[in-house]
């Protein structure tokens, strides 16, 4: 039963209704390696989970031509918009995976592939009965440990305080991750501001930044 469900999810994940040279194809039998992501091998690789309209990764890709950016996004309208922006800027260091990363993550990529992973404003699922749907949990931290090398970085942002506090506790319990300086930041300069983040700031919402370094595999 579990195997049948997994096969069905892989089938859904592979069912993209349009094609693009900027797509990567996930496979249940072969993990993606840095040698087959782009036409060349980059110095470092950056993964954005839930890339939305692509503005964050595209801004960073323009500034960091020696880094390969992989975007995981499941919504077709956002993917189409991102592709148009990639083409507009003639970027050769951005690729997209149309895969729900809550279904498949470490199953898709080889170990230690990414030096940085970004997760911006995932659904906080505020109601207690929905907490099990939250992306960041102990299993997710294990996935980060697989995909990041030692000293690899994870960037996270949310505007929901209880979720931020829960994640801080998860990282404390893990022991594998360490804050760079402080456990919680109110500003972050390493990552461009997304449309969603700007909107929340304009609404007067507090943004919680939780950035961690992998110190123990």
UniProtKB/Swiss-Prot annotation:
Gene: trmB
SUPFAM superfamilies hit by this protein: S-adenosyl-L-methionine-dependent methyltransferases
Function: Catalyzes the formation of N(7)-methylguanine at position 46 (m7G46) in tRNA.
UniProt KW keywords: Methyltransferase, S-adenosyl-L-methionine, Transferase, tRNA processing
Protein name: tRNA (guanine-N(7)-)-methyltransferase
EC number: 2.1.1.33
Binding site for substrate: 127, 159
A cellular-component GO term for this protein: tRNA methyltransferase complex
Pathway per the UniProt entry: tRNA modification; N(7)-methylguanine-tRNA biosynthesis
PROSITE patterns: SAM_MT_TRMB
Family: Belongs to the class I-like SAM-binding methyltransferase superfamily. TrmB family.
Active-site residues (renumbered): 123
Binding-site residues for S-adenosyl-L-methionine, renumbered to this chain: 48, 73, 100, 123
Any GO molecular function: tRNA (guanine(46)-N7)-methyltransferase activity
Catalytic activity annotation: guanosine(46) in tRNA + S-adenosyl-L-methionine = N(7)-methylguanosine(46) in tRNA + S-adenosyl-L-homocysteine
